[in-house]
């Protein structure tokens, strides 16, 4: 009887999770209230440099992106392209935007982040590798039209952001990735699925979203910084390590922090986090 009940529950779970967005992704509403009042005073920005963009992704979806900086800066300065983690919208990363916008000095670097389909105000649903690649491409097309080149682009992927960042770094980016920061990356769909369902089922049983971050890193020829905590229960260190250490590119750096969890920057502090990131950008 227990076995039959388990099979029934499993079948129900498989059916309900056939849509990847329901199983893997935590997309939701966003307010997009990007103002200094919500920032730590030391990370406040020039509010005239806050730009909310709507970009066409694929044939019919619209994704929303936040650019902080002067548009003219894109053609001359280093731009941070931030791929956020598994939260309802990029609202959760406004403080991160402020931090990046104040590295070195206020607006030394341009900064852009965006919501994947189904996150925040972005339309549609994130359904797999193709939809996430299309969203990334939409942002890169905008930056490329503004004059961004590969030698001035730094891609920063937080947690779930490793899903689009990996294939992009491995050759799927219209602006080739030369510098990549992987912060607490999700490295296998199995781990993400287990976190979402609480069951140790292979992701292939539930979703067609398969990704191989290890292969992506093996194929990535540029510079890589990997940052992780030893106590990360969301993106386990061991699985991330196996993927990251396949990198054989021009430069590899890892920063592993004892006792830190998935909220790495909060655990180690902004000063240490910023130092490691800035040193890598300047390398």
Please place each PLM-identified region on the residue numbering:
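Short beta-strand/loop motif that positions the catalytic acidic residue
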Residues: 220-221, 225-232
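An N-terminal hydrophobic leader/cap segment in hydrolases
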Residues: 16-56, 68
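Alpha/beta-hydrolase active-site loop
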Residues: 126-147
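Short alpha-helix in the alpha/beta-hydrolase fold that links the catalytic acid
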Residues: 95-96, 213, 222, 236-246
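Hydrolase active-site cap/lid region
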Residues: 164-216
């Amino acid at each position: 009887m227990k076995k039959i009940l388990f099979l029934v529950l499993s079948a129900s779970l498989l059916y309900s999770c056939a849509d990847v967005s329901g199983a893997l992704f935590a997309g939701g509403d966003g307010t997009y209230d990007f103002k200094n009042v919500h920032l730590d005073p030391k990370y406040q920005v020039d509010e005239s440099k806050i730009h909310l963009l709507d970009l066409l992704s694929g044939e019919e979806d619209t994704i929303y992106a936040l650019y902080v900086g002067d548009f003219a800066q894109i053609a001359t300065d280093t731009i941070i392209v931030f791929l956020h983690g598994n939260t309802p919208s990029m609202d959760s990363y406004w403080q991160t935007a402020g931090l990046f916008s104040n590295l070195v000095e206020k607006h030394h670097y341009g900064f852009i982040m965006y919501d994947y389909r189904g996150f925040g105000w972005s339309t549609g649903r994130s359904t797999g590798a193709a939809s996430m690649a299309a969203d990334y491409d939409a942002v890169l097309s905008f930056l490329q039209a503004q004059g961004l080149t590969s030698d001035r682009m730094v891609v920063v992927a937080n947690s779930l952001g490793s899903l689009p960042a990996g294939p992009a770094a491995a050759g799927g980016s219209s602006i080739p990735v030369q510098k990549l920061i992987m912060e607490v990356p999700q490295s296998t769909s199995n781990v993400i699925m287990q976190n979402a369902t609480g069951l140790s089922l292979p992701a292939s049983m539930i979703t067609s979203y398969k990704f191989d971050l290890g292969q992506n890193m093996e194929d990535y020829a540029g510079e890589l910084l990997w940052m992780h905590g030893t106590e990360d229960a969301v993106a386990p260190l061991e699985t991330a390590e196996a993927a990251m250490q396949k990198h054989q590119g021009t430069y590899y750096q890892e920063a592993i922090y004892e006792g830190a969890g998935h909220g790495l920057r909060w655990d180690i502090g902004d000063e240490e986090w910023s130092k490691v990131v800035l040193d890598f950008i300047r390398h």
